[in-house]
UniProtKB/Swiss-Prot annotation:
Location of region: Disordered: 1659-1686, 1852-1905
Implicated disorder: Cenani-Lenz syndactyly syndrome: A congenital malformation syndrome defined as complete and complex syndactyly of the hands combined with malformations of the forearm bones and similar manifestations in the lower limbs. It is characterized by fusion and disorganization of metacarpal and phalangeal bones, radius and ulnar shortening, radioulnar synostosis, and severe syndactyly of hands and feet.
Primary residence: membrane
Family of this protein: Belongs to the LDLR family.
An annotated Gene Ontology molecular function: scaffold protein binding
Effect after changing N1214A: Compromises Wnt-suppressive activity
InterPro entries found in the cross-reference section: 6-blade_b-propeller_TolB-like, cEGF, EGF-like_Ca-bd_dom, EGF-like_dom, EGF_Ca-bd_CS, Growth_fac_rcpt_cys_sf, LDL_receptor-like_sf, LDLR-related
Protein name: Low-density lipoprotein receptor-related protein 4
PROSITE patterns xref list: ASX_HYDROXYL, EGF_2, EGF_CA, LDLRA_1, LDLRA_2, LDLRB
Organism: Homo sapiens (Human)
Keyword Transmembrane attached: yes
Effect on the protein upon substituting C160Y: In CLSS; abolishes the antagonistic effect of LRP4 on LRP6-mediated activation of Wnt signaling
Length: 1905
């Protein structure tokens, strides 16, 4: 409370300034100026009062720095002159207030779990570096800046934020450093068609635009709206649509976001009960001169009399005139007060005598005595105050002073003691409390996300993002849940505190849930809703929802709970702002505060301090009070532009402010120490302190059994109450009814509500339904408890149980404005009117067997009711001639019964007892009734009916809804009297019904075997009482009971999300959805097979072609791969084929009707082919092409005889059809807006229909053409010969695409291929001259012209993100074919095993290695764990091992092909290994590494003898492949943009191709090198010898990755591991000179041996003679050593063994295995072993000599050898020293992005990321920024190839041949090198083993170098 000062005696002067200005105090010369107060007040005192030991200023500022009289011997003299007890010195407390009593104290020893402060205090070690100044001198917070994690960004102030927040356009660092030095801002992506874009770029659903809610957060979604939702009475609507209290209009304070409430205001609009501030603002008159600055400019406190006594400090005296003086001036003989009250007899002042002296009897003082101006002045010790007698002292009750203790306080004589609640601990200052447990976290809603911030560090993290409009917030610490409300979605949601498992809690019946509170003791959820003016409660999962408080509530906002006391508190900022409380069961409601409140927003409870705090956004203040509302006090009244929410923790307040977009803090007692925790937030909303002590433990009054309650158990004081969900009656003290028997049912557009008649409160609650957007009509069926409703926004009819369960859509097609609904509870039929289509329809109650009853002479039919007893239905029609009609429920006997004095006849109701028909007329403003035949018409209510809409009857009452009064009312159904209002202030009221269980039963013939009807049996007024009817589009047969099986003649069309049919057999046009039970995304092309009754369609979003029966059954996808944009589709019903065009791939393809035997027919010179039609009898197919040069073409149906028919005056030729009868070709052009025709050769061109707005699909049947139009959203018809008589077939059909006309009665015609497929083995395709046989893409046709090879022999296999594809090299058309492997996400690396015919691949999205057959079957995961980024993969087809690189883990691993026996081979000195390749015959393993030091390395297949081959002049070595014939390695460098090669030792290096764009992977076959390129999106090849003859094999392929060749020539040769796994139990690794056995890193159930032995062969399901091109599993004739290799006779697979293998004894000439006799293998091994021992000694000697010779001639000082020892394969400590090549600066900031997605154009100028790190990127950045120039080291250009000639050409420097290692390699390969020219004459021929493909192959000739 601010002190008010008057004109004081002795020149005391008060200078009070407004809160908005900074005071400048100037006192007179004879006065002392006190310190300026926190409220800006100035105080002047007489100068002689300074340093007199008296607190005259009230803040001791007049005594600061004064030298006071000497303290008594029993006291301690502080440095500031203060006297304290000596016993208080060095006790750890700052009693002097300058810490001088704690200086020079002996050091205090702290415990082991304590931290020693520099000031001598001891605090808990846990408090060290927790961001809180616990020591008092901040010595516990002098900490090193904490390190940010790898996924965090460090702000300039040292705080850490999430890395992805860097440069995201949102300031997340407190200093804004995360948004500095960012690249140019990227414009926000546009919103889609169903969204609205806010002013700052955010997208919201379009339905939220102009709905009256601030969904954008800046009101931009509500600006420029033509109309807004009307505000309530007592509210003012801002221009933006916001509703505020009407009293805030022209009150001088801008409450509207656009300040429109203060526009056009007169000079004064204040009432007689208000005071006008200088600013023009109006405040209550009672607030004038109350000591509070309510005007915010202090004008309400100016010129005030002294209306009350200010509160003086504890050591001050209150004068009668209100002045405060120091206690020492009391009874000092001087009139210090000015009114002599300090010297009056009432103060027991005794007369002064001259003998007074402190030396005599201590001057009569009880404690301290001092002489002041010659007189005795008695004073007291600290903790005491001088009594009125001026001599004695009494104890000061410090506990009565707020803020002395943080929580608890106990007073004692001359002292006090602070204490803390459970869960807190007293700090070293002995006054404040610190919470035990984890560091506190501020949890706050930020509209679009929910974040956590550390208040002492200003660091915050994201908890939940991508939210719509999160406002209210709370948490449940024990259950680790966070709850929030979203006022845009009108939902309450929850999630785990780690952000996972988001789920809806309350999803219906909310309008503006602005407050949320969790009862953590009883597990309940409470919330306020200012839209519905309610406070509700439910379980934590939203179950058992109950309206707790609803009466006398206006706009409840904030809510807080005190579960320990069973109390709920809330704020209400309606017309009468207040803060209220009640028990948590809603009882005991009471007002806490209702004065000096404007806009009470946030509310929080200090449980330990037993106080509440709230913010007032309009009053700009933070206040506190006791929990009963007493001791109310303003804590902060300055610097609060718009506080919204508040929380408290320990001694601090934290609040959010909308205006400053910040989180702030201050001391909860004084309001001082204000600090900005976070600013520059998006839109801070609710805030809470996340800490266990904010939810202290309490007694659960309901116990473990919910208090015995069947539903809700709610605390009530210290007891509890059993409560029922809203509407359910209580049947006992603890039990509720399980169902509702009768209730009023009404629609409110966005929800459907009920008012139970089982309870007395008549409060409405929402039926929990999803996606109700604009409900209008209602009805119900009590037999199955269903409620039905129509929705005119979604154009659907739905139903659900009365409790909201079992919700389903029953009719969702061909509805435009279903406004009326009626249930025939007798025959279970659903009737409805549609004002958009002007129809009345009926269906079964589940929506099946729908049919049109009345379609003529209807003009906006509205409501409908049925009377099953008489068999009639009644409806209102409020078109041009308003009327009420009736007809039989089968549409018979139609007649108008009321046609006069009607305007807008709305609701209808039937009184079945009195046989009356009631209706409401909104135009006539009446409710009337008449007999069921229209007679005896009478007005029931004719006044005070502004706009009645819905109408119903129940019992003796009639109920109706009124749009204008926004109410539900009732009256007596016979007299119209006794009117009452059931509910009011309900927006958008629609239909109304009473659900009950007393509908009269009616007998009907339809109940017996459906009346004999095959489909629909309807009630009828005819003598039989019923009639049979057929579903829409189907005719009733002559028997009057049976319907035809289906449509004979019909249109069928695609509408993107569905396929529909329009029957041409009936007299009206009505579309019917083909009930295919799948989700369609973008259905475009369509075709029909009338023979089997199937429809075919393409979906360009799902990339598939599908088919189903015309009744929707038997759906199947026939083409699922290799499609991009299938715009055209045609079914050859005669030839049983399906044809389609693909605009994305620019191809025309054909396949069998089941999708098999797929073939590309046309692929050259196509540019966006679209429509396609067939003429089987003529053998032609026609198609449109609307590319750059639009044209219409024709070819044979086998792709032959291609010709352009028309190529001029075409724009966008869309639809295409053939008129076989008149031999005409017809097409629709959307650009020229014409439908044209020509003959079948393109001649005689003429226009049929013009203009047409945007035609798309075109078809023909009989004498008419039909077309779809995008712009009119309609289907049109015209005469096919003249184009005249254009009519509208169906309208209001958005998304119209292709269309076909079908007459199933027409004969199909003759099949050119006959009954035996023309003798073709695969495809038989018609052509003008007959037919031709064709093969699926990539397979060759044999010489007989009829038979196809079973499969391709040589082909490319490549990966492209989500696909694996094949390109045959056997045929000339290099078109790709998808390998149908399922579940591909992000495939990177590939390899193939020719033995089992399986493809192996890595998927870095799933982090797995998988394999599958080439037909897509038998897909299985080989390695499914422990992978991060598997970039490289290689199959050892001999040893049956699998190798891979892992860039994420920097390892090279191996396993068996089935994933077993997994082992890490190399895990050191690797920095992002990429490609990998194996050479089993030589036992070599090669890989590239493009880390910090790019290199290419080689090792043995077990990882030993590791060697760096190339480490200079490398950038990003990506792909790697081996040429097994020429013994060379090839690689691509994506940084240097070239393809290079070298020999197997890294020598004879040669640049093959320069200036390639961005190569990724490569492979070799025959004389060609093939590679994939990211930038050109293509597969290319060059001659491997010259680097010339560059060709593009395949273009326009997104996301190209790995590529390999599958060929019988690739996986040849063998080694010792090829026979029975080398005798190893687990892993067998071939090496350059021997082989080794190895054990897996994780042992399995089998014992592992490192010594080769006899291992029984594993049984095989398939014989090796059938599949395997390598050695079969047979026991070795010799036991292999792990260090030596024995020459022995092994099996040979003819054609797979080289001469060198044969010379080494690795090949046998017989295909039959020769098993060893018992013991023979051992004897032979002994003999051979002895021989080899001698040879080994000789070899070692020779090797030593060679080594010395080599060393003398060649030394590589930069190369260190890596040695590996069996079995651990640990590397030696010797490091490989390689020259480091620097990477770009941003290289290390990039990560491997695994999510799939489209690749954008890569250009040399724009590629964002280093390709090897992020294989997926769609962003743009400067490519040159990523590359750094690397200096060439001038290496040798070498060319080492095996030539067909007998010479070797080596271009090298003169010193190059001194390399003895290279010379040795050349000599070795002279005997091995085979010619790669397949055209040469073979030296021998032999049969090849079957590799899975049947083939014949010519062997290559051999020549010596």
């Amino acid at each position: 409370m601010r002190r008010q000062w008057g004109a004081l005696l002795l020149g005391a002067l008060l200078c009070a300034h407004g809160l908005a200005s900074s005071p400048e105090c100037a006192c007179g010369r004879s006065h002392f100026t006190c310190a300026v107060s926190a409220l800006g007040e100035c105080t002047c005192i007489p100068a002689q009062w300074q340093c007199d030991g008296d607190n005259d200023c009230g803040d001791h500022s007049d005594e600061d720095g004064c030298i006071l009289p000497t303290c008594s011997p029993l006291d301690f003299h502080c440095d500031n002159g203060k006297c304290i007890r000596r016993s208080w010195v060095c006790d750890g407390d700052n009693d002097c207030e300058d810490d001088s009593d704690e200086q020079d104290c002996p050091p205090r020893e702290c415990e082991e779990d304590e931290f020693p402060c520099q000031n001598g205090y001891c605090i808990r070690s846990l408090w060290h570096c927790d961001g809180d100044n616990d020591c008092g001198d901040n010595s516990d917070e002098q900490c090193d800046m904490r390190k940010c994690s790898d996924k965090e960004f460090r702000c300039s102030d040292g705080s850490c934020i999430a890395e992805h927040w860097y440069c995201d356009g949102d300031t997340d660092c407190k200093d804004g450093s995360d948004e500095e030095n960012c690249p140019s801002a990227v414009p926000a992506p546009p919103c889609n068609l169903e969204e609205f874009q806010c002013a700052y770029g955010r997208c919201i659903l379009d339905i939220y635009h102009c709905d009256g809610d601030d969904d954008c957060g800046d009101w931009s979604d509500e600006s420029d709206c033509s109309s807004h939702q009307p505000c309530r009475s007592g509210e003012f609507m801002c221009d933006s649509g916001l509703c505020i209290n009407a009293g805030w209009r022209c009150d001088g304070d801008a409450d509207c976001d656009d300040q429109s409430d203060e526009r056009n205001c007169t000079t004064s609009m204040c009432t007689a009960e208000q005071f006008r501030c200088h600013s023009g603002r109006c405040v209550r008159l009672s607030w004038r001169c109350d000591g509070e600055d309510d005007c915010a400019d202090n004008s309400d406190e100016e010129n005030c009399e002294n209306t009350g006594s200010p509160q003086c400090a504890l050591d001050q005296f209150l004068c009668w005139n209100g002045r405060c003086i120091g206690q020492r001036k009391l009874c000092n003989g001087v009139n210090d007060c000015g009114d002599n009250s300090d010297e009056s007899p009432q103060q027991n002042c005794r007369p002064r005598t001259g003998e007074e002296n402190c030396n005599v009897n201590n001057g009569g003082c009880a404690q301290k005595c001092q002489m002041v101006r010659g007189a005795v002045q008695c004073t007291c010790h600290t903790g005491y105050r001088l009594t009125e007698d001026g001599h004695t002292c009494q104890d000061v009750n410090e506990c009565a002073e707020e803020g002395y203790c943080s929580q608890g306080c106990t007073n004692s004589e001359g002292a006090f003691q602070c204490w803390c609640e459970t869960g807190y601990e007293l700090r070293p200052d002995r006054r404040s409390c610190k919470a035990l447990g984890p560091e506190p976290v501020l949890l706050f809603a930020n509209r679009i996300d929910i974040r956590q911030v550390l208040p002492h560090r200003s660091e915050y993290t994201l908890l939940l993002n991508n939210l719509e409009n999160a406002i209210a917030l709370d948490f449940h610490h024990r259950r680790e849940l966070v709850f929030w409300s979203d006022v845009t979605l009108d939902r309450i949601l929850r999630a785990n505190l780690n952000g996972s498992n988001v789920e809806e809690v309350v999803s219906t019946g909310l309008e503006s849930p602005g407050g949320l509170a969790v009862d953590w003791v009883h597990d309940k959820l409470y919330w306020t809703d200012s839209g519905t003016s309610r406070i509700e409660v439910a379980n934590l999962d939203g179950a058992h929802r109950k309206v707790l408080l609803w009466q006398n509530l206006e706009k409840p906002r904030a809510i807080a709970l005190h579960p320990m006391e069973g109390t709920i508190y809330w704020t209400d900022w309606g017309n009468t702002p207040r803060i209220e409380a009640s028990s948590m069961d809603g009882s005991g409601r009471r007002i806490i505060a209702d004065t000096h409140l404007f806009w009470p927003n946030g509310l929080t409870i200090d449980y330990a301090g037993r106080r509440m705090y709230w913010v007032d956004a309009k009053h700009h203040v933070i206040e506190r009070a006791n929990l009963d509302g007493s001791h109310r006090k303003a804590v902060i009244s300055q610097g609060l532009p718009h506080p919204f929410a508040i929380t408290v923790f320990e001694d601090s307040l934290y609040w959010t402010d909308w205006h400053t977009k910040s989180i702030n803090s201050a001391n909860k007692f004084t309001g001082k120490n204000q600090e900005i925790i976070r600013n520059k937030l998006h839109f801070p909303m609710d805030i809470h302190t996340l800490h266990p002590q904010r939810q202290p433990a309490g007694k659960n009054r309901c116990g473990d059994n919910n208090g015995g309650c069947t539903h809700l158990c709610l605390p009530s004081g210290q007891n509890y109450t059993c409560a029922c969900p809203t509407g359910f009656r209580k049947i006992s003290s603890h039990a509720c009814a399980q169902s509702l028997d009768k209730f009023l049912l009404f629609a409110r557009r966005m929800d459907i509500r009920r008012i139970s008649f089982d309870t007395e409160d008549l409060s409405d609650d929402v039926i929990p339904l999803a996606d109700v957007r604009s409900a209008v009509a209602l009805d119900w069926d009590s037999r199955d408890d269903h409620v039905y409703w129509t929705d005119v926004s979604t154009d659907t009819i739905s139903r659900a149980k009365w409790d909201g369960t079992g919700q389903e859509v029953v009719v969702d097609t061909s509805l435009e404005s279903p406004a009326g609904l009626a249930i025939d509870w007798v025959t279970n039929k659903l009737y409805w009117t549609d004002a958009g289509t002007d129809r009345i329809e009926v269906a079964n109650t589940d929506g099946s067997m729908r049919t049109v009853l009345i379609w003529e002479n209807l003009d906006r039919p509205r409501d409908i009711v049925v009377e099953p007893m008489g068999g009639y239905m009644y409806w209102t029609d409020w078109g041009a001639s308003p009327k009420i009609e009736r007809a039989g429920m089968d549409a018979s006997g139609r007649q108008v019964i009321i046609s006069s004095n009607l305007t807008w006849p709305n609701g209808l109701a039937i009184d079945y007892g009195s046989q009356r028909l009631y209706w409401a007329d909104a135009g006539m403003k009446t409710i009337e009734f008449a007999g069921l035949d229209g007679s005896k018409r009478k007005v029931l209510i004719g006044s005070q009916l502004p706009h009645p809409f819905g109408l119903t009857l129940y019992g003796e009452r009639i109920y109706w809804t009124d749009w204008q009064t926004k109410s539900i009312q009732s009256a007596d159904r016979l007299t119209g009297l006794d009117r009452e209002t059931l509910q009011e202030n309900l927006e958008n009221l629609m239909d109304i019904h009473v659900f009950h269980r007393r509908r009269p039963p009616v007998s009907t013939p339809c109940a017996m075997e459906n009346g004999g009807c095959s489909h629909l049996c309807l009630r009828s007024p005819n003598p039989s009482g019923f009639s049979c009817t057929c579903p829409t589009g189907i005719n009733l047969l002559s028997d009057g009971k049976t319907c035809s099986p289906g449509m004979n003649s019909f249109l069928i069309f695609a509408r993107r999300i569905d396929i529909r049919m329009v029957s041409l057999d009936i007299p009206y046009f009505a579309d019917v959805v083909v009930p295919i039970n799948i989700t369609m995304k973008n259905t475009i092309a369509i075709g029909v097979d009338p023979q089997e009754g199937k429809v075919y369609w393409s979906d360009s979003t799902l990339h598939r072609i599908s088919r189903a029966n015309l009744d929707g059954s038997q759906h199947e996808d026939i083409i699922t791969t290799g499609l991009q944009t299938t715009d055209g589709l045609a079914v050859d019903a005669i030839g049983r084929k399906v044809y389609w065009t693909d605009t994305g791939t620019n191809r025309i393809e054909v396949g069998n009707l089941d999708g098999s035997m797929r073939k590309v027919l046309v692929w050259q010179n196509l540019d966006s082919p679209r429509a396609i039609v067939l003429y089987h009898e003529m053998g032609f197919m026609y198609w449109t092409d609307w590319g750059e040069n639009a044209k219409l073409e024709r070819s044979g149906m086998d792709g032959s005889d291609r010709a352009v028919l028309i190529n001029n005056n075409l724009g966008w030729p869309n639809g295409l059809t053939v008129d076989k009868a008149s031999s005409q070709l017809l097409w629709a052009d959307a650009h020229t807006e014409r439908i044209e025709a020509a003959d079948l050769n393109g001649a005689n061109r003429h226009t049929l229909v013009s203009p047409v707005q945007h035609p798309y699909g075109l078809t023909l049947l009989d004498s008419y053409i039909y077309w779809t139009d995008w712009q009119t959203r309609s289907i049109h018809r015209a005469d096919k010969g003249t184009g005249s008589n254009v009519i509208l077939v169906r309208s209001n059909l958005p998304g119209l695409m292709d269309m076909q006309a079908v007459d199933r009665a027409q004969p199909l015609g003759f099949n050119k291929c006959g009954s035996r497929n023309g003798g073709c083995s695969h495809l038989c395709l018609p052509r003008p001259s007959g037919f031709s046989c064709a093969c699926p893409t990539g397979i060759q046709l044999k010489g007989d012209g009829k038979t196809c090879d079973p499969s391709p022999e040589t082909y490319l296999l490549f990966s492209s993100r989500g696909s694996i594809r094949r390109i045959s090299l056997d045929t000339s058309d290099h078109t790709d074919v998808h390998v149908p492997v399922p579940e591909l996400n992000n495939v990177i690396s590939l390899d193939y095993d020719s033995v089992d015919g399986k493809v192996y691949y890595t998927d870095v999205f799933l982090d797995v290695i998988r394999r599958a057959d080439l037909n897509g079957s038998n897909m299985e995961t080989v390695i499914g764990r422990g992978l991060k980024t598997t970039d490289g993969l290689a199959v050892d087809w001999v040893a049956r091992n699998l190798y891979w690189t892992d860039t994420g883990r920097n390892t090279i691993e191996a396993s068996r092909l089935d994933g077993s026996c997994r082992k890490v081979l190399i895990n050191n000195s690797l920095d992002e290994p990429r490609a990998i390749a194996v050479f089993p015959r030589k036992g070599y393993l090669f890989w590239t590494d493009w880390g910090h030091i790019a290199k290419i390395e080689r090792a043995n297949l077990d990882g030993s003898e590791r060697k760096v081959l190339i480490n200079t002049d490398l950038g990003w070595p990506n792909g790697l492949t081996l040429d097994y014939d020429t013994r060379r390695i090839y690689w691509v460098d994506a940084h240097l943009d070239r393809i290079e090669s070298a020999d197997l030792n890294g020598k004879l290096r040669q640049v093959l191709v320069s200036h390639v764009s961005h190569p990724f992977a490569l492979t070799q076959q025959d004389r060609w090198i093939y590679w994939t390129d990211w930038q050109t999106k293509s597969i290319q090849r060059v001659d491997k010898y010259s680097g010339r003859n560059k060709e593009t094999v395949l273009a326009n392929v997104e996301g190209l990755m790995d590529i390999i060749v599958v060929s019988p020539q690739r996986q040849t040769g063998t080694n010792a591991c090829g026979v029975n796994n080398g005798g190893c139990t687990h892993l067998c690794f071939a090496r350059a000179s021997d082989f080794v056995c190895a054990c897996p890193d994780e042992p399995d159930s089998r014992p592992c041996s490192l010594v080769p032995g006899l291992v029984p062969p594993a049984p095989r399901a398939t014989g090796m003679s059938e599949k395997s091109p390598v050695l079969p599993n047979t026991p070795p004739t010799t036991l292999y050593s792990s260090t030596t290799r024995t020459r022995t006779s092994l099996e040979e697979v003819e054609g797979r063994c080289s001469e060198r293998d044969a010379r080494l004894g690795l090949c046998a000439r017989s295909n039959d295995a020769v098993p060893a006799a018992p013991g023979e293998g051992l004897h032979i091994s002994y003999a051979i072993g002895g021989l080899l021992s001698i040879l080994l000694i000789l070899v070692v000697i020779a090797a030593l000599m060679l080594y010395r010779h080599k060393k003398s001639k060649f030394t590589d000082p930069g190369m260190g050898n890596l040695t590996y020892s069996n079995p651990s394969y640990r590397t030696s400590t010797q490091e490989v020293k390689i020259e480091a090549i620097p990477k770009p600066a941003m290289y290390n900031q990039l990560c491997y992005k695994k999510e799939g997605g489209p690749d954008h154009n890569y250009t040399k100028e724009k590629i964002k990321i280093v390709e090897g790190i992020c294989l997926l990127s769609g962003d743009d950045a400067e490519w040159d920024d990523l590359k750094q120039l690397r200096s060439s080291r001038g290496g040798l250009l070498r060319d080492h190839v095996c030539m067909k000639t007998d010479t070797v050409s080596i271009q090298a420097s003169s010193g190059s041949l001194d390399d003895t290692e290279t010379e040795q390699l050349l000599q070795e390969e002279q005997s091995e090198c085979s010619s790669v020219h397949t055209a040469a004459t073979p030296e021998r021929r032999g049969s090849l083993p079957d590799t899975g493909w049947k083939h014949e192959r010519k062997l290559s000739s051999e020549s010596q170098v």
